[in-house]
């Protein structure tokens, strides 16, 4: 994998003005983005998140997942902290792509869970790769991270690429009656670290 830095621009948001850094994977043609806020330290832990693209949750306000809620919460947390980053990776549908994600949703509408749906389509439960995070973090000057995630695979990926994860910061937001089963599957079958908050019934 060859990641090339392309350009940086300002990105005004409801939480403040971020910097948007564009990257291209010259082998696959995929385009990735790093958002940064404030001054990032190479010596001190920086609050950050690895976020995989989710068109339905991030842009279309879907309640089937917690992705959009997590993205907004991460941006707000970073702004309130005063500095931080988000690596926005173009890996829709845990790496299977948008149309296959819609096919998986169709199977879920018929009773399959999120893992079963992927497997019925001939995919692994999670097809995402994280090779691009090292050159992206090198470009923005981050070596030590307070990582906002519930996913142990992201913690492992950072450590494998020589990035110190000083702290895992839970990001448990967005539970609702449409995604309760999905969240439970992420916990029980994909190993995501979640508290009982996600399994209470107050929003039914």
From Swiss-Prot:
Alphabetized UniProt keyword annotations: GTP-binding, Hydrolase, Metal-binding, Nucleotide-binding, Riboflavin biosynthesis, Zinc
Keyword check for Metal-binding: yes
Annotated residues for binding of Zn(2+): 54, 65, 67
Any one annotated GO CC term: cytosol
Metabolic or biological pathway, per its Swiss-Prot or TrEMBL entry: Cofactor biosynthesis; riboflavin biosynthesis; 5-amino-6-(D-ribitylamino)uracil from GTP: step 1/4
The EC number(s) this enzyme carries: 3.5.4.25
Cofactor note: Binds 1 zinc ion per subunit.
Reactions accelerated catalytically: GTP + 4 H2O = 2,5-diamino-6-hydroxy-4-(5-phosphoribosylamino)-pyrimidine + formate + 2 phosphate + 3 H(+)
Residues annotated as the enzyme's active site: 126, 128
Enzyme category, top tier: hydrolase
Keyword Transmembrane: no
Domain of life: Bacteria
Cofactors required: Zn(2+)
Binding site residues for GTP: 49-53, 70, 92-94, 114, 149, 154
Protein name: GTP cyclohydrolase-2
């Amino acid at each position: 994998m060859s990641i090339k830095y392309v350009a940086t621009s300002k990105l005004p948001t409801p939480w403040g003005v971020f910097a948007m850094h564009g990257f291209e994977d010259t082998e696959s043609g995929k385009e990735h983005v790093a958002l940064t806020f404030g001054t990032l330290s190479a010596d001190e832990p920086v609050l950050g998140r690895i976020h995989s693209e989710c068109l339905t949750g991030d842009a279309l306000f879907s309640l089937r997942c917690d992705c959009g809620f997590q993205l907004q919460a991460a941006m707000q947390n970073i702004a309130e902290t005063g500095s931080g980053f988000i690596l926005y990776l173009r890996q829709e549908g845990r790496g299977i792509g948008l149309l296959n994600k819609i096919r998986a949703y169709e199977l879920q509408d018929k009773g399959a869970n999120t893992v079963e749906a992927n497997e019925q389509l001939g995919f692994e439960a999670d097809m995402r790769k994280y090779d691009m995070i090292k050159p992206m973090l090198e470009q923005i000057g981050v070596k030590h991270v307070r990582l906002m995630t519930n996913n142990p695979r992201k913690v492992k990926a950072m450590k494998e690429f020589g990035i110190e994860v000083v702290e895992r910061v839970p990001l448990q937001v967005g539970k609702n009656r449409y995604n309760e089963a999905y969240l439970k599957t992420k916990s029980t079958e994909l190993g995501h670290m979640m508290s009982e908050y996600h399994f209470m019934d107050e929003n039914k």
